[in-house]
Amino acid sequence: STKNIFQIISNEQSQIGSLHKNLEFYVEINSLNNTISKNKNSNQTIIEIPLHRFSKNDLVQPTFLIGENLLDCHLYLTYSRWLSRSHWNQRLPSKLNAILIPGGGDTTEKLLNHLSQDGRYFSLCLTDSDIKYPGGNIGETTKKCQKLTLKEISHHLTIPVRASENLLSPEQIHQVLNIDHTRNILLNNLKKITRFRNTDAWLYFPLKEGIRPIIGPHQKNSRDEYWQITAYANDSLENEFLYPGISTDLLKWTVDYLKNYDPEKIKDSNLISAWTKISTTVIAWTCASEPIRA
C-alpha cells in the first residue's frame, strides 16, 4: 500500500541520515521548480530536479556508468564499494548500482554525449588520461569528453593515470600474479618496476607492455627524456626491455581475482589520492536504495 511505501522511505531516511553531507554530488527534489538546475554549495554540487520529472521511471533507473571497457567499469565499482567500507569506514545503508556501458575510442564520447542530450537518465563517464609521462598531453578520448557541454544529470571524470592498470598497487598486482603459478614468472618483472611506486612514474608507466630501447637514429622527445630511453644502433637489443611490463591481461586477471577476494590495502599516497577522487564520485552517482516492494 501507499502507507507502507512511505513507512519504508521514512525508515530508510533515518538510516541514511546526513550521508548526503559527505557526497560531492547529490540530488534534491524540488516541487516548485520546473526545470533541472545545478548549484554549487561550498565543495558540493547540488542537482535540483522538479518533482514532476519523476512521474516517469527514467530518473529512478540505475545510473549509466560509461567506461572505456567493461573491465574498467567493474574495477571502479568494486574498489568504490570496498573503499566506502574499509578505508574511510563510511557506512552505506544503500548499495552501488549502475548499468555498465563499454565505450572505447570515439564510442565513449558519443555515448556520453547521447545520454546527456537525451536527458532522461543519470550518466557518469570515467576515462583515463592516457598521459605517457608527467606533463604530457591527455589522450584523444578524454580530450573529446572534456569538450562536451553536458546537461545537469551527466558527469565526466578524468582519471589522472595512463590507464586503469596504473591504479593497482604493487601489492595488488603481486596477489593477482601469485594466485596462479603460470603467472609467477611475471613476479620478477613486478620487482623490477616496483622502484617507481609512490611516484608520478607509477601513474604513467606502461604496465601492460613495458618500455623497450629505441633502435636506430631517433630524435629524443619529452617522453624519452623522462623515462631515460636510449637509442641503440644494435638491433640485437630489439627484444630487450629497459623496464619490463606485466601483461596485457593484467586488468582481466585483476577483475577476476576481485570476484573472490577483497582488494589489497592501498598504502601509497598517490594511489590513495586517485582512488579517493574516483570512489567519492562513483559513490555519489551510483548509490541506490534497494527496490521497494510493499
Locate the predicted segments by residue.
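Acidic, divalent-metal-binding catalytic cores of TOPRIM
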Residues: 1-294
